[in-house]
């Protein structure tokens, strides 16, 4: 699939994510993060619900002509979507969360090629993603690499490579 065609699809999907979806996604994620330490959970939610709506706006404001046109492996898109569908728990607000995450994550991975977390996100141990010389380094890249995560699709390298 051509990147511009995929971007057009994502742009259409971005208009399907409304304020109620954002509210439902927040309710869902708050429940899903119940057992995390409160200070970590609070920061993660703030970063997530600042970053993801910003990326949605970015998608809505970009034109197809601004996107470099290249081939995207459709199997990779299906693999990412499948992983997103398998993440987290089942809940009433899951559909809203999934709609938001699929649109934003696919854009970040395949079109914009940026980290999947905001650069301000604090991970356990207080570490953050670092940008250096146009490369991104993540403190949890290798720790989270498994068949259920989407880390393998992220542009970040492991922090230990820095």
Swiss-Prot record:
A Pfam family reported for this protein in Swiss-Prot or TrEMBL: DUF2115
InterPro entries in UniProt: DUF2115 (IPR019215)
Taxonomy, superkingdom: Archaea
Family the entry assigns: Belongs to the UPF0305 family.
HAMAP family in the cross-refs: UPF0305 (MF_00763)
NCBIfam families noted in UniProt: PRK01022.1-1
Name assigned to this protein: UPF0305 protein MmarC6_0221
Lineage: Archaea, Methanobacteriati, Methanobacteriota, Methanomada group, Methanococci
